[in-house]
Amino acid sequence: GGEQSGHIADVGFDLYMRMVGEAVNDYKTGIIDKEEEAPECKVELPINAHLAENYVPGERLRLDLYRRLADVAKPADVQSIREELLDRFGELPEEANALLAVAQLRALAKSHGIREVVATGKFLRLAPLTLPESRQLRLMRLYPGSIYKAPTRTALITLPKNPAWNPSKPAAEIVDTSLLTWVTEVVDQLTKASTT
């Protein structure tokens, strides 16, 4: 569309068409590597985590920050965004800190191939997660009532009883980030366990 016509105006139509043709040919012949995208990781926790309008005023900038946070691959990327927010907008409000913590959790989960971190009912669901039998027993000992389904590589970890984490409450009301801390510890424990 309009973005392409800007490129065409810069280089001229004939040169632009030749460049596009060469790029398509390079891609088809394998000269350009087809990038493997890291699997998406869905994190669903009942917690208030967002960038408020009164903190980051521009909608376009907020959307860009959300995209960047969703794409982070390692904790250092989250730290870089945290420093940028501090520099541009000052001290982070609670919900912005929670959003950065969710991004760090997502990066940790992605780095171990986990695509789902979901609090549902009375369980935290992690999938896919491969646990050898010794680690399954450890899971049951550390988190009584938990279930591991080997065929689907799904761990259902019993959530601690805490009224602030009630999934029936709207997420906007939940400001307690201890669930997020607990989930991060669980993912860290189980991924360390699955790599030994």
Task: Tell where the protein language model's regions lie, with residue ranges.
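Accessory helical-bundle/CTD segments and flexible terminal tails appended to RecA-like ATPase motors
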Residues: G1-T196
